[in-house]
Amino acid sequence: MDILISSLKSLGYSRTSKSLDSGPLVVHAVAGAGKSTALRKLILRHPTFTVHTLGVPDKVSIRTRGIQKPGPIPEGNFAILDEYTLDNTTRNSYQALFADPYQAPEFSLEPHFYLETSFRVPRKVADLIAGCGFDFETNSQEEGHLEITGIFKGPLLGKVIAIDEESETTLSRHGVEFVKPCQVTGLELKVVTIVSAAPIEEIGQSTAFYNAITRSKGLTYVRAGT
């Protein structure tokens, strides 16, 4: 536990007032904060840590065990579960829980540590995310390209992501290929178009919108409202 806490502090995580005696250590970080990278380094340096994820596990490597799907935990190891908010039935075997609660807020717990700074999301996109009510900032040096128009006021470029049923229906009616936010989890996309039936000022703290727009690392287009 001490090694993990020291690592979190060195990475700039902030401490909340929640007592460390209350259940597993809960750590929250926004998209692009380097959470998974930090966990991989922890495993590499300290073999007594085991990290499982409810998200996408690492590919098999000859160098390290990496982040694995849930399974047996070696006796005596400190067990960490990443993406714990994706399910509330798997967490009991773990001594630390990591997640971005904005991606799946339903099962999130009160954290002991948090980091609301992304190192990947472009500045213009980060400003839009914050403007929708999320505690979110970025240290990225990329300004990024962000264009916001009505659904029919601009082209649909790159990966098209529909964030509500009405926009799915509209895109299907016009024969446009699209994906849902859950289908791009963990991806980093150079060109993204997000389609919303609601205008941008009405989106607010939409989980679907957050999951979609945080996939962008380059050109971002939002087609929202009429």
UniProtKB/Swiss-Prot annotation:
One of its GO terms (molecular function) is RNA binding. It comes from the Viruses. Keywords: Host cytoplasm, Host-virus interaction, Inhibition of host innate immune response by virus, RNA-binding, Suppressor of RNA silencing, Transport, Viral immunoevasion, Viral movement protein. One of its GO terms (biological process) is symbiont-mediated suppression of host innate immune response. GO terms for cellular component: host cell cytoplasm. The keyword Transport applies. InterPro entries: (+)RNA_virus_helicase_core_dom. It is found in: Host cytoplasm. Residues 1-115 form the (+)RNA virus helicase ATP-binding domain. The keyword Transport applies. Residues 116-226 form the (+)RNA virus helicase C-terminal domain. It holds the Pfam family Viral_helicase1. Belongs to the Tymovirales TGBp1 protein family. TGBp1, TGBp2 and TGBp3 seem to act together for cell-to-cell propagation. TGBp1 is the main movement protein that physically cross the plasmodesma with the viral genome. TGBp2 and TGBp3 would facilitate TGBp1 function. Homodimer and homooligomer. Interacts with capsid protein. Interacts with host AGO1; this interaction targets the host protein for degradation, thereby suppressing the antiviral RNA silencing. Transports viral genome to neighboring plant cells directly through plasmosdesmata, without any budding. The movement protein allows efficient cell to cell propagation, by bypassing the host cell wall barrier. Increases plasmodesma size exclusion limit. Acts as a suppressor of RNA-mediated gene silencing, also known as post-transcriptional gene silencing (PTGS), a mechanism of plant viral defense that limits the accumulation of viral RNAs. This is Movement and silencing protein TGBp1. It comes from Potato virus X (strain X3). The lineage of its organism: Viruses, Riboviria, Orthornavirae, Kitrinoviricota, Alsuviricetes.
